[in-house]
Regions:
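AMP-binding/adenylate-forming catalytic core of the ANL superfamily
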Residues: 1-64, 74, 81, 87-90
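General small-molecule cofactor/ligand-binding pocket signal
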Residues: 69-72
């Protein structure tokens, strides 16, 4: 089933401590791909992952809630100001990110 990254991003930035968010699909051992959300916080005080996921769960169906939250200082953008999901995937790859259920 298709999950809207825009819906997840909008739900995440609704959290008072999140200034920007990007949702992307990552490899999942059972479901082929599942969403995670990458967030930039307003300050150095980062909310707990479950706090963000619980906040998102109020706005989307249970099966759409991302499986993980990754904190970054900034999310890469294209020259036109859009989130560069290609560069974001590269950053996650460079970090050796693995879906939590794959470990």
């Amino acid at each position: 089933e298709w999950i809207s990254s825009i819906d997840l991003e909008n739900a995440a930035v609704g959290h008072p401590d999140v200034s920007e968010a990007a949702a992307i699909g990552v490899a999942h051992p059972k479901w082929d791909e599942r969403p995670i959300v990458v967030v930039v916080c307003h300050s150095s005080k980062k909310p707990e992952k479950m706090d963000i996921l619980n906040f998102i769960s109020k706005n989307v169906a249970k099966w759409q809630v991302p499986d993980d939250v990754i904190y970054m200082d900034e999310i890469p953008h294209t020259a036109t100001g859009k989130i560069s999901k290609l560069d974001l995937r590269k950053k996650l790859s460079d970090m050796n990110y693995v879906h939590p259920e794959s470990e």
